[in-house]
Amino acid sequence: MMKKLIILVLISALAAGMIACHDNSSDTSYQKETKSVVQTEYETQPEMQTSAIQTEALQEVTEAPVQKETGQADQKKTDFDPYSTDNVYDLNPALFERQDGTDYGTLLTDVTYFSTTADDDKRVNILLPPGYDETGAYPVLYMIHGWGGDYTAHLYDGSYLHMLYGNMYRDGLAEPMIIVGVDMYTGKQAIKDDLDGYGLRAAYDKTVDDIAVDLMPFMREHYAAAQGRENTAVAGVSEGGAKSLCTGFQWLDKIGYIAGIAPDGNVISVSGYYSDSYWSIPYFDVLPQPAQDTMPIYLYLAVGSEDPWNIHSTEYFSEVLESMGVSHQYDYVEGFGHDSDFWRVCMYNFIGKIFK
């Protein structure tokens, strides 16, 4: 009897042990299965019912794809390649004229700011785009006039640049942007009329620093001007074309888009260009080499076949840029001279390729 009792006890203990082992095995299997489901949902997210904990976890992991899509959308804006299309110079004159029913934005004239570079007040004209919102952030194009001009040369009520931008914006050819008519003269206003060519050239050179040090901060403080080189462009014609190249290469970390239209040959030394003259004094001994992250986003050079002065200098600048490995677009355009007919078609091309 005692032997039977002992045997029954041993059998009961063994059965309990087997049941316990089975329960532990089931727990381990469930944990592995649950972990596998979470990993699978992270990668493929199949349609299935999930617990509250799993649902919360999935909400957290799916935030990553949302951020990625936002980044892709931001990147898509920079995927536009301004070098992928040729520029156009045979344009309808109506592009530069006022058209009924077109919003040409808001033109602010004779806006004054203090320039520490000039140690005096300077003035600019400012074009705000249609629908301007002071709480927004708009890229800015700084436009520099030629020798003897001022901030009103290209941007005044009804000017070609004023009408051109409004018409391009209406047709979806231009991005919302602020355009600033820059005064290249950077010095004491009281002595401007007394300066000779060398003195005027020295005052013009100072605009390179004035734009970056004084004017850009003024625009950000008083207007909805976006920061960053991807939101900043500089363009100029003739002497202003030289200064736009100087400004762009002096401040590569601040300026991403540069246009030198028939630029004078004083950015760097150009052999045979007005020797021993204030026209030929080089601003740079050597053109600064951009780092990989400060390469111009779009660099545009153009000159007309009938230009009496700056064909050689423009071509030389292009050759130097090519030797430096700096991407740029150089157009030698048949039939155009050194005048506003050329400036306006070039600005059409430049405005259509910036801030995309």
Predicted regions and their residues:
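Positively charged n-region of N-terminal signal peptides that target proteins for export
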Residues: 1-10
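C-terminal motif of bacterial Sec signal peptides marking the signal peptidase cleavage site
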Residues: 17-20
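Bacterial signal peptide processing site
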Residues: 22-24
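Post-signal peptide N-terminal segment of mature Sec-exported envelope proteins
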Residues: 29-52, 56, 63
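Non-catalytic cap/lid and distal C-terminal segments of serine-dependent acyl enzymes
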Residues: 32, 54, 61, 65-356
